[in-house]
Design a protein with these regions (language model features):
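C-terminal halves and exits of single transmembrane alpha-helices
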Residues: 89-104
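Interfacial segments of multi-pass membrane proteins
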Residues: 30-42, 91-95, 138
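Hydrophobic alpha-helical transmembrane segments
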Residues: 25-30, 50-54, 109, 113-117, ...
Length: 163
């Protein structure tokens, strides 16, 4: 039962089987919209969202590890929880450090859109050290950490232009 839950968790249920192309992109877009809704419409505090994301990060590691035996590849495209984790990084850091500026929902959505675009660029191009992690670590750590690095690259890139 727990293995089935882990499988559904790491594939974000609907993206594992329903979406056949661009799973990572769809999962990243889902993440942006999900976080936007819970922060700007449901008004869940950034502290609570941060704790939730940390729990998801930790659980993702164990869920991916237990689910990998169900796949032939070492980094299967069906696993998209890593995109969720990586895409969450720039969003939650933005909210932690800039959330007090009272952005309108429209302004926040525009900013989140840039996070989405940049995350997909860094996740796709895999600049160093993302490419190194992606090639060197064909395991749970590699699956998660390359997307974490892509999220960090988004933060670094936008920090340079002072968003």
């Amino acid at each position: 039962m727990i293995n089935k839950f882990n499988y559904y968790f790491v594939t974000l249920l609907i993206f594992g089987n329903s979406v056949q192309k661009y799973r990572g992109t769809w999962a990243s877009l889902f993440t942006v919209l999900f976080l936007f809704i819970i922060i700007y419409f449901l008004k869940i505090s950034v502290f609570v969202v941060t704790i939730l994301l940390l729990i998801i990060l930790v659980y993702s590691y164990f869920a991916i590890a237990s689910s990998l035996k169900n796949f032939k590849e070492s980094d299967p495209q069906e696993i998209v929880i890593d995109e969720f984790v990586g895409q969450s990084i720039p969003i939650i850091l933005f909210e932690i450090f800039h959330g007090d500026r009272n952005y309108s929902a429209y302004e926040a959505l525009q900013i989140y859109f840039w996070f989405f675009l940049l995350f997909r660029v860094f996740d796709g191009l895999k600049p160093f050290p993302i490419d190194y992690v992606d090639k060197k670590f064909k395991n749970t750590f590699g699956i998660l950490f390359d997307d974490i690095l892509a999220g960090i690259y988004v933060v670094l890139c936008l920090s340079l232009i002072h968003i």
